[in-house]
Curated annotation (Swiss-Prot):
This is Protein PR-L5. Keywords: Pathogenesis-related protein, Plant defense. GO terms for biological process: defense response. It comes from Lupinus luteus. Belongs to the BetVI family. Induction: By heavy metal ions.
Length: 20
C-alpha cells in the first residue's frame, strides 16, 4: 500500500500524516 515504506505500521501512518 502507500505506507509500504514502514509496512503500514500505526506509527508509519501517523508519520505519513505529519509529512503530508
Amino acid at each position: 500500500s502507500i505506507f509500504a515504506f514502514q509496512d503500514e505500521s500505526p506509527s508509519a501512518i501517523a508519520q505519513a500524516k505529519l509529512f503530508k
